[in-house]
Design a protein with these regions (language model features):
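Conserved mid-core segment of classical short-chain dehydrogenase/reductases
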Residues: 345, 371-388, 430
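Catalytic loop of short-chain dehydrogenase/reductase
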Residues: 274, 372, 415-440, 445-450, ...
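Hot-dog-fold acyl-thioester-processing enzymes
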Residues: 2-67, 115-205
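Conserved glycine-rich cofactor-binding loop
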Residues: 293-294
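Conserved glycine-rich Rossmann-like NAD(P)H-binding loop of the short-chain dehydrogenase/reductase
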Residues: 309-324
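Catalytic Tyr-X3-Lys loop
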Residues: 381-400, 441
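HotDog/MaoC-like acyl-thioester-processing domains
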Residues: 1-11, 64-143, 208-287
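C-terminal helical subdomain
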Residues: 261-262, 396, 454-455, 459-461, ...
Length: 508
C-alpha cells in the first residue's frame, strides 16, 4: 500500500557538509555556491546519494532484515530548503519503494529489497583512510573511453558516517554501516573520480553480499574497481560497473550511470567580430548591460565594444569572469568597465546613476539582460510561492534599471533593450514562472515606450541559446551560440531608428 509521509524531506546546508565529510565527495556542484551559480542549476545541488539515504530513512523499521539490493534513479536535481514530499510503497514484505517529489515532479525513485538477517553493523569501526582525492578529477571528453578501469581503497570517515546513520535512523531500517559506506563510495567515485568534476549522477543499482554486513575484520576498508562500460557522447552519459570487496571477500557490486556535464564553450571572439565587424561608430557612446559577465550579456558587451562603445557591464557575483572579459576587450576600440551589483536593488541603481553622470555624463544604451537562475516548476500548490518569487525577482531586475536610468537614455535619444525569450510565444512545460516573468517585462517595455517617447524601446526574443540557463545534458541540444544573436542585435542597434510603441524587434 502506498502512503505519503506526514512530513517532507528537507535538506539544510549542514546535511551537505556532513555528507561531504563522511564520503570525501567534495564535488563543487554540491559545495561551492560560486561554482554552482555558473551552472544551469544556479545554486548548490543536494548530493543524490544523500537524497537516497533520506528516502531510506522514511521506511518502516525492518527488524530481522537487512538491505540486499538497492536501485535509485536521481530523476531531477534537489536543492537546499525545499520540502520534498515522500511517497512510500511497502506493500511487499521484502521490497519497498520510495519517491521524493517536488509537487508532481519526481526527483528521486528508490527501490529497496531486503533479506532476512540477524543483524546489521550499526556503527562503523576502524580508522578513516586518507581520501584518495581532495579535488575532483577533471577528465577531458577524449579520456572518457569504454574500457577505462580505476581501482582503489576507500573508507568513509567513521564519525561522520555514524552521524549520517543516526541522522536518518537507518540501522533500524536494515541499513547498516557497510551498506551506507558502499553508497558513499558510489557518490565519491562519480563525483571525484569518474566522471569527476563535471559529474551529474543519474542512477545506481547495487547488490550487497550478505557476508559483507558483518565481515570477520570490521575495520577493513573497501577495495573497489570501477570500469567504464559505455560512453554515449551525444549526451555525455557514462555507464559504469562497480565491484567492491572487504579483505578479499565480495561486498557490493552494481551499475552506476552518470553524465559528464559539458562546460560551455568559450565565446568565439573571431566569430563575433566576423559577424558584427569592427569600427569606431559608437565612440563616445556609453552603454550599460546588466548580467554582462557571461553568456548573452557578455557577447552583447563585446559586440558594442568592437564598435568603440564604452560599456559598463554589471554582474552580481562573477567577478573573475567580468575581469577576464575586461582583459579580452582591452584590444577593442571601446572599453569594458565591470560593475558589481544587483540589478534589482534600487539603492544600487541610484548609486549607479550618480556614477554614470559623474564619470560619463550620459547613457546612450541600456540593455536589461539579467535574470534569475531557472528551475523547472509546475503550476501547483508546491510551487506557487517559488513561482511568484521568481516573477517578482525577474521583474525587479528590469523595472529597477528602467526606473532609474531610462530618462538618461531618453535625453540622448538612445535605445533601451529588454531581453525576453521566444518562450513567450511557445511556452515550455515546467517554465510558468519564466514565461510569466518575460511577459511581464515585455509589458514594462511597452509602458516605458509611452512614458519616455524620446527613447527607442526594444524587446528581443532570443531562441534557445547555449548559456548556463539550458546547459544540461538534454537542454543544450540544438541551442545556438549567443554571440551570433548578440551580433544581430548590435547591428540593428547601430542602424537609424525612431522610437515606436511597437517594441518587439524580430531578429530572425
Amino acid at each position: 500500500m502506498t502512503h505519503e509521509a506526514p512530513a517532507p524531506v528537507r535538506f539544510e546546508p549542514a546535511d551537505l557538509g556532513l555528507f561531504a565529510a563522511a564520503s570525501h565527495d567534495v564535488n563543487p556542484l554540491h559545495l561551492s555556491a560560486a561554482y554552482a551559480r555558473r551552472t544551469a542549476f544556479g545554486e548548490r545541488v543536494v548530493f543524490g546519494v544523500l537524497g537516497a539515504l533520506a528516502a531510506l530513512g522514511r521506511l518502516s523499521p525492518q527488524p530481522g532484515r537487512s538491505l540486499a539490493k538497492l536501485s535509485v534513479e536521481f530523476a531531477g536535481p534537489m536543492f537546499e530548503g525545499v520540502g520534498y514530499a515522500v511517497e512510500v510503497d511497502e506493500s511487499s514484505p521484502l521490497r519497498a519503494k520510495v519517491k521524493l517529489r517536488d509537487g508532481r515532479r519526481v526527483v528521486l525513485r528508490l527501490t529497496a529489497r531486503f533479506r532476512d538477517a540477524a543483524a546489521v553493523a550499526a556503527t562503523p569501526a576502524g580508522d578513516a583512510l586518507p581520501p584518495p582525492r581532495t579535488e575532483a578529477a577533471d577528465h577531458p571528453d577524449a579520456a572518457l573511453v569504454a574500457g577505462l578501469a580505476l581501482t582503489g581503497r576507500y573508507a568513509a570517515a567513521p564519525s561522520a558516517l555514524a552521524a549520517l546513520l543516526a541522522r536518518f535512523e537507518l540501522s533500524p531500517r536494515g541499513v547498516g554501516s557497510r551498506h551506507a559506506e558502499a553508497l558513499l563510495l558510489a557518490s565519491y567515485l562519480v563525483g571525484m573520480e569518474l566522471p569527476g568534476r563535471r559529474a551529474l549522477f543519474s542512477d545506481l543499482a547495487l547488490d550487497f553480499d550478505a557476508a559483507s554486513e558483518l565481515p570477520p575484520d570490521p575495520t577493513a576498508p573497501l577495495d573497489w574497481t570501477l570500469r567504464l562500460d559505455a560512453v554515449h557522447p551525444d549526451f555525455g552519459m557514462l555507464s559504469m560497473s562497480l565491484a567492491t570487496s572487504i579483505a578479499g571477500a565480495p561486498a557490493a557490486r552494481g551499475k552506476l550511470t552518470a553524465f559528464a556535464r559539458h562546460e560551455l564553450p568559450a565565446a568565439s571572439d573571431d566569430a563575433l567580430e566576423a559577424a558584427v565587424g569592427r569600427s569606431e561608430a559608437l565612440l563616445g557612446r556609453v552603454a550599460l548591460v546588466t548580467g554582462a559577465s557571461r553568456g548573452l550579456g557578455a557577447s552583447i558587451a563585446h559586440a558594442l565594444a568592437l564598435h568603440g562603445c564604452t560599456v559598463i557591464g554589471t554582474y552580481l557575483s562573477s567577478a573573475a569572469e567580468a575581469e577576464a572579459l575586461a582583459a579580452r576587450l582591452s584590444s577593442t576600440p571601446g572599453r569594458f568597465i565591470p560593475l558589481q551589483g544587483d540589478a534589482g536593488d534600487p539603492a544600487w541603481a541610484a548609486a549607479t546613476r550618480a556614477t554614470l553622470l559623474a564619470e560619463h555624463g550620459r547613457l546612450d544604451l541600456l540593455i536589461c539582460n539579467a535574470c534569475p537562475a531557472l528551475r523547472p516548476l509546475w503550476l501547483e500548490p508546491a510551487s506557487a510561492q517559488r513561482i511568484t518569487e521568481h516573477v517578482a525577482r525577474s521583474v525587479a531586475m528590469v523595472a529597477v534599471p528602467l526606473s532609474h536610468l531610462l530618462d538618461l537614455v531618453a535625453a540622448q535619444r538612445g535605445s533601451a533593450v529588454v531581453v525576453s525569450s521566444s518562450a513567450v510565444v511557445d511556452p515550455p512545460a515546467e517554465w510558468p514562472h519564466y514565461v510569466a516573468a518575460k511577459c511581464a517585462v515585455e509589458a514594462l517595455a511597452r509602458v516605458a515606450a509611452v512614458e519616455q517617447p524620446e527613447a527607442r524601446l526594444l524587446v528581443v526574443r532570443p531562441p534557445k541559446l547555449l548559456t548556463e540557463l539550458v546547459n544540461t545534458p538534454m537542454g543544450r541540444q540544438d541551442a545556438l551560440a549567443p554571440e551570433h544573436f548578440a551580433a544581430r542585435l548590435v547591428r540593428r542597434l547601430m542602424e537609424p531608428g525612431e522610437p515606436s510603441r511597437d517594441v518587439v524587434l524580430e531578429l530572425g
